[in-house]
Amino acid sequence: TTLFRSDHALKAQDAFEKELIAYNRQIVEEGNKKQKLIILLAGRPYHSDPLVQHKISNMISAMGVYVITDDIVRHQDIPLKEVNFLAQWAFTNRILKSAKWAAQQGNHVQYMQLTSFGCGPDAFLIDEIRTLLKQYNKNLTLLKIDDVSNTGSIKLRVRSLVESLHISLQQAEERQVQKPLSLPLFTKKDRKKKIIAPFFTPFISPLIPSIFKVAGYEMETLPISDECSCDWGLKYSNNEVCYPATLIVGDIVKAFKEGRYDPDNTCVAITQTGGQCRASNYISLIKKALIENGYTHTPILSIAFGSGIDNQQPGFKVNWLKVLPIALAAVLYSDCIAKFYYAAVVREKKPGQAAKLKDMYLEAAKPLILKNRPEDLLSYLSLAVDEFNQICQQKSCPKVGVVGEIFLKFNPFAQKDITTWLIDRGIEVIPPLMTDFFMQSFVNMKVNQDSHIKKKYIPDFAIDWLYGKVQKQIDKINKIGKAFLHFQPFENIYEKAEKAKQVISLNTQFGEGWLIAGEMSSFASQGINHVISLQPFGCIANHIVEKGIEKRIKSVYPQINILSLDFDSSVSDVNITNRLLLFVDNIK
């Protein structure tokens, strides 16, 4: 039977792993006995292939060095409390544990790691390993390998390393373990401190401080990123990490470097959604940057919307029953203002009218949020409908939908403000919505439970009841918004999910998950056939759920025209503009 075969396979796998562990331990015992140099060669599972790793392990052993792998720590309980890293990938956890194991051994045991260019979590994993080894006065040797056939430089590095290690063994000095630096926890006494948070979007970011005030905290949103943010971010985060992380780290470091905030009386907040995306480790990157700059008295708050996020903050307490209704209303309100603004700005009778109304209504929302009056926000939307109608000319405009990674598609600086570029050419931008990002959770919960990926700890009727409460508010917004002449209503998230199912499995929930497919399908079904997808360069998750679905989505919607743009801190303005010009030529 299948069950018997699975059980047999698992037992065989377990026996194989035990054999690997035993063989590695045997090599270590022999090396220890002879006090010979031992190198722990760590890497991805595929680096065990001699072809992929260019026989580096053979090369090292031919020099009289004992070579072991990270399998030495399999099934060992090695705590990683001092590491700023979200332990959610099995192989990265093993690599970290092997680095700590090697660090704790004598000087004759050294650590070497193989990495392939652009390999996901390595962007922050390598920094953590380097810091970990440094605490034990050991160095990280990192070999970047790819498919090149010329391995001369690698051989030279390996030979040089082995020779230098042999020399250092003869001059071995007593090592002193350094105590790892860490940031304090957010405790009850920190509740009165000012909290700063990175800028996200021109629509919801201005309202976040008011929402936090309702929760009992004083928060300020940092200014939108600039070139200075890029410079600080590149200096204090790994240059191969995704672009949003560079900007977020840079914004926070810049705020303290410019003296706008006292690090001893300030806390940093960052939202986290969990999941396989590298964004789950943003909090670790921020902690590392603060420690490197000496801001060791600044606690970090994780505002988590997903599971698997572990950040101890015993003093952070929120009455969510009090805050969630006004927070939901604020998100819907800001999304609705975004719909009004983007439809009106290409039709405004006088330049600047739409921007003026947008700013006015976002500012008007702040006192209503402070008073915790969600219904009053709806009343203001009714007023906004009339005013946005008055500034619009009656004309038809070509439309472009914007999708992509959440930070890129919402943040003007990160995307080089391409929405304004399109508006200046008379193209109506159909904006991304925060509402959909949160509403997809209802679909994901049901899909995960029905697929037996997660246990059914929430009954369907409870999910449906909560969804109904939220959908009721969305229906109210749609009812008010339809009075605006160019309003496109909020779509039912389950209907969007059904469209996405034609393209991709709803179990695909990493990165933006199935939402990109759903948004593209929704645009195409509404006759919006031109879509721009914005991604950070090297964003593995979104490359799969966006670029990976293009062929399929074009087979379902042959008329759709997709432009994928990748961004990082060094992307060429000219390259982006040229691609946009070619894209626009197909619209008009």
How would you label these PLM feature ranges?
Residues 1-588:
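An N-terminal assembly and electron-transfer interface module characteristic of large anaerobic redox
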